[in-house]
């Protein structure tokens, strides 16, 4: 199928997917209507409701496909605009950080890689699954990874505007005391042997900058990398 998203500049993934569905509504809804009408006939005469389920699966699958293509094209456009390379799928086994230790069926998609001021940078979408049956849930995140010189102890900065990362921290981590105005927005976890050094790093000025620029993002410093994660991928937009 032709990728119509390649013809437009995508600023908002959700809006572009919605526009695509509305502009090609016949592809989505005419098969649904046909399957639904056929399903009603089969239910009335044969008592089999399976075809009704198929009609709804068609719509859900079509919407998911359109959204996925919009997300891929957004990342391709972002990569071209910043001289990055669109890689596609990535290897979870190579990743460091507490986020990548939880759940099953882990996957990295729409990976792009590049460099800025000699620092390697990667952006990608990450997902994993927890639970089973009625309790099965897929967790989705947008992730940025930046490499820097030197090594850092494993420090986690948990944004209280996003998901609770405290349950993912290492057994040897300790939550550090910070001023109440900052504690309302963030929680900081560090190895017990690096408590003083970490508090010296996260000064009030640094925490103020985090509130201005990183509210809603979880951060992790591990070895020579900084990870920034956010679970609100449904609002993934291009920002200037």
Sequence positions of predicted segments:
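Charged, compositionally biased non-catalytic regions
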Residues: 54, 60, 65-91
